[in-house]
């Protein structure tokens, strides 16, 4: 087998929407980096059972609506 074919697997801090920080193993970033979530199981309507506002942090929903505005969706 080839050596060094797998990415580095290390511990990072994941910051939830409510501010709590959980340590997880990941290949993202480097040891000790912090990943901040925009949405997580405690705030997602699929897991909370409620209807929540739609988060458009990347502008993807707005871009989609503008692109297909003339189709009457």
From Swiss-Prot:
One of its GO terms (cellular component) is ribosome. GO terms for biological process: translation. SUPFAM superfamilies: L28p-like. Keywords: Ribonucleoprotein, Ribosomal protein, RNA-binding, rRNA-binding. It comes from the Bacteria. GO terms for molecular function: rRNA binding; structural constituent of ribosome. PROSITE patterns: RIBOSOMAL_L31 (PS01143). Gene3D superfamilies: Ribosomal protein L31 (4.10.830.30). The keyword rRNA-binding applies. NCBIfam families: L31, PRK00528.1. Binds the 23S rRNA. Part of the 50S ribosomal subunit. Belongs to the bacterial ribosomal protein bL31 family. Type A subfamily. PANTHER family: 50S RIBOSOMAL PROTEIN L31, CHLOROPLASTIC, LARGE RIBOSOMAL SUBUNIT PROTEIN BL31A. This is Large ribosomal subunit protein bL31.
């Amino acid at each position: 087998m080839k050596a060094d074919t797998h990415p580095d697997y290390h511990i990072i801090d994941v910051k939830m929407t409510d501010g709590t920080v959980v340590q997880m193993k990941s290949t993202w970033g480097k040891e000790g980096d912090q990943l901040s979530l925009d949405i997580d199981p405690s705030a997602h309507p699929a897991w909370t059972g409620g209807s929540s506002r739609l988060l458009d942090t990347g502008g993807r929903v707005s871009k989609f609506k503008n692109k297909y505005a003339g189709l009457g969706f």
